[in-house]
Amino acid sequence: MARVKRGVTARARHKKVVALAKGYRGRSKNCYRAALQRLEKALVYAYRDRRNRKRDFRRLWIVRINAAARQWGIKYSQLMKGMALCGIELNRKMLAEMAVNDKAAFEKVVSAVAGTCGYACAVNQQDK
């Protein structure tokens, strides 16, 4: 059986790992073993945080919706329940975007919910 020299494949593998570790600090950017460990840890963090990002954004959207809704005298939970009863199907991402950038549209949603459910909110009191 012929002898296999593994230098070429090992060198290619090492180069790939070191290239992926570009931008790291210290030995992690150019020492293969340190780079491999740092890279594995980075991939673990990336996997974990792709899931955490979904949670974090949902929490952010809820905080923004709640803050905007309370300016009109209605709580987040009341707003969401009222939207379900009214048949308004806006997801939290779009609702938070409206609350920040399109206050007039958000006010219309709040007034529709308040009118249907009978919540006393600032929108209804301005009309009177």
UniProtKB/Swiss-Prot annotation:
InterPro entries per record: Ribosomal_bL20, RIBOSOMAL_L20_CS, Ribosomal_protein_bL20_C
Family, per entry: Belongs to the bacterial ribosomal protein bL20 family.
UniProtKB keywords: Ribonucleoprotein, Ribosomal protein, RNA-binding, rRNA-binding
Origin species: Anaplasma marginale (strain Florida)
Protein name as catalogued: Large ribosomal subunit protein bL20
HAMAP family the record matches: Ribosomal_bL20
GO terms for biological process, alphabetical: ribosomal large subunit assembly; translation
GO CC terms of this entry: ribonucleoprotein complex; ribosome
Paired cysteines (S-S): none
Record has DNA-binding as a keyword: no
Molecular function GO terms recorded: rRNA binding; structural constituent of ribosome
Described function: Binds directly to 23S ribosomal RNA and is necessary for the in vitro assembly process of the 50S ribosomal subunit. It is not involved in the protein synthesizing functions of that subunit.
CDD domains the record matches: Ribosomal_L20
Record keyword Oxidoreductase present: no
